[in-house]
Amino acid sequence: MLFRSAASAEYVDVDEILKPKETEPLILVLDGVEDPRNLGAILRTAECAGTDGIIIPERRAVGLNDTVAKSSAGAIEFVKVAKVANLNRLIEKLKSKNIWVVGTSGDATMDYTEWDWTRPTALVLGAEGSGLHRLVAENCDVLVKIPMYGKIDSLNVSVAAGVVLFEAKRQRNLTTDN
């Protein structure tokens, strides 16, 4: 399989991701993900889960590059990716469009399965190791956690994306099947 190079990958404007659609939006926001293989895996997961797009910060985060393209296994062709200068302003914009902003944090009290993912939602995932920046976490409408049952206290960010996005997809499928 041939992978598109990052040179041919184009960012879209945030408003392209936020365009109204027939279904409630499910948007992924990444706060400082720096590993290109993680971003590639997240692109692949986001495409498979049917998200509307991914929004990343312009600084202190990996952008689209050849490693991301290869790690995405072709998903870079289909997922809309936008860059923004300020995630906190983005969160304000999302809220103004009645999109719930749900961050992930190991310190959260709500389990990710307790959130109603059928709502218009932007899922915010933090950087490898450090998680969400303090202001980003404070600006989220709600924080959820993925419970850990072993001795390690967190998942890789790309794995966490898969766990939560597919819970959102599961809940959305339940409402459309009824």
Regions found by a protein language model. Give the residues of each.
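Post-transcriptional modification and biogenesis factors for structured RNAs
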Residues: 1-178
